[in-house]
Amino acid sequence: MPATVICPSRAEEKLLRKQGFILIAGLDEAGRGCLAGPVVAGAVIMPPRLKGDWVEMVRDSKVLSPAKREYLYCHIVSMAVTFGVGAVDNEQIDSMGIAPATRLAMKQAVEDLTCQPDFLLVDYLKLPDIPLPQKGIVDGDALCFSIACASIVAKVSRDRLMSKLDMEYPGYYLAKHKGYGTALHVECICQKGISPIHRRTFAPLKGMIDGL
């Protein structure tokens, strides 16, 4: 049987609005486990009332096709109160580690918003460097509407960036796998070597470097 795809709920947002919070931002990241490129975060504040068939199509970005992500991205950014994007490159990731880099990207995304949120709904993480009320939700991108929207913004933003990097670093097929550790990507690294945008502290790249 195919796996059941969870429909994100707006229950968290409704509860927070009853408590007096108005500008509720969802946050999520894309590219955390990749071998190349940045980790990218999206922050989105959606209005309480939304109309259109697209609203019921919102899901965790990981279960959507590229075409559907692009379609939903256009609706999300056009209907959002505000949205922001943050990115931390591979050199910073290698220097500070992926968890701090992810938190930094999320902080940048919040700072990119045109108005300050009064509450953050975050996929999994807690963000101690952001002095705002917040809640980390395990599997938040699948369960919470605002976080699911943020996951789509982060994923589409990163995918577009990786397609641009594909032109700068041809032969790695970055536009195809977006920097994830696919068999094709690893084969390209073995043939062409490690590029300036690869994460040198990530396996199997670290093992390749240590073996030189």
Swiss-Prot record:
EC top class named in words: hydrolase
Cofactor binding, per record: Manganese or magnesium. Binds 1 divalent metal ion per monomer in the absence of substrate. May bind a second metal ion after substrate binding.
UniProt-listed HAMAP family: RNase_HII_B (MF_00052_B)
Major location category of this protein: cytoplasm
Family under the similarity heading: Belongs to the RNase HII family.
Catalytic activity reported: Endonucleolytic cleavage to 5'-phosphomonoester
Role according to the record: Endonuclease that specifically degrades the RNA of RNA-DNA hybrids.
InterPro entries: RNase_HII (IPR022898), RNase_HII/HIII (IPR001352), RNase_HII/HIII_dom (IPR024567), RNaseH-like_sf (IPR012337), RNaseH_sf (IPR036397)
Required cofactor names: Mn(2+); Mg(2+)
Keywords attached to this entry: Cytoplasm, Endonuclease, Hydrolase, Manganese, Metal-binding, Nuclease
Protein's recorded name: Ribonuclease HII
Gene Ontology BP annotations: DNA replication, removal of RNA primer; mismatch repair
Binding site for a divalent metal cation: D28, E29, D123
Domain RNase H type-2: 22-212
